[in-house]
């Protein structure tokens, strides 16, 4: 995987298929759900660790910036 570009985005601007760094790991976002009552974004994602494909989820403040990656 080659990183082509990085930028800071708020989680509300993430879309399924985007790559981002979440909890120090490069992940592929699989779904984004805005939670207006909590002022947060619920992200589901998948990532690879030790050759295994895993999935995870995070509830992130809508005001927190996330570094996104464009990969080739």
From Swiss-Prot:
Q: Which domain of life is it from?
A: Viruses
Q: What is this protein called?
A: Gene 83 protein
Q: Which organism is it from?
A: Mycobacterium phage L5 (Mycobacteriophage L5)
């Amino acid at each position: 995987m080659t990183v082509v570009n990085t930028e800071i985005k708020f989680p509300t601007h993430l879309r399924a298929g985007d790559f981002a760094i979440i909890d120090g790991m490069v992940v592929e976002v699989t779904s984004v759900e805005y939670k207006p009552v909590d002022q947060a974004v619920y992200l589901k994602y998948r990532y690879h660790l030790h050759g295994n494909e895993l999935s995870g989820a995070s509830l992130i403040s809508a005001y927190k910036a996330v570094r996104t990656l464009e990969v080739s």
